[in-house]
Amino acid sequence: NSLLPLPVKQVLNNHNLKGMHNILGNLIEIENVYSLAISTALGASSSNIVVDNSECAKTAIKYLNDEKIGRVTFLPLDTLKPKEIDIDTKNTLNNEIGFIGIASNLIKYNSLYSNIVSNILGNVIVVDNIDNANRISKIINHRYKIVTLNGEVLHVGGSITGGFNKTSNIITIKYELENYIK
């Protein structure tokens, strides 16, 4: 975890802080074929720390402030609510060429984290390529984020992000290491 931001490392390594689980990226398993799409969908959330409750987050934030270490985003198990795609849109998507699935359904995780995973990925659509992503985005009126297997993003409202990305996050590094070991 040497690639984690320093404040995240400091919090995770401080054994006086109770209720810290891990960073989200370490609490999920992703098939290699989906790793770029999911890591793109997660973005900085992959380094957010899952905690038991908002009190644990407050205690950790006090520590970060007192020590002037930096900022961290916490995902409290007791407050995050699931997000999902409405049933009509799901039915539409199921008939569309290129639709792969909802991001939260393409990964494995302990059911304890289902609200958190659903909050971050439950309304993100994964599609095979940018052409199908563009077409599907228009059909659903740009109401949901769409990511492609190559990591392009069609944002809510219609803006598009893409191109080569040489930065890595915890997910892509985890899979590069696994492939290297194989």
In which residue ranges do the predicted regions lie?
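Hinge-like oligomerization/junction regions that interrupt long coiled-coil arms in large cytoskeletal
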Residues: 2-182
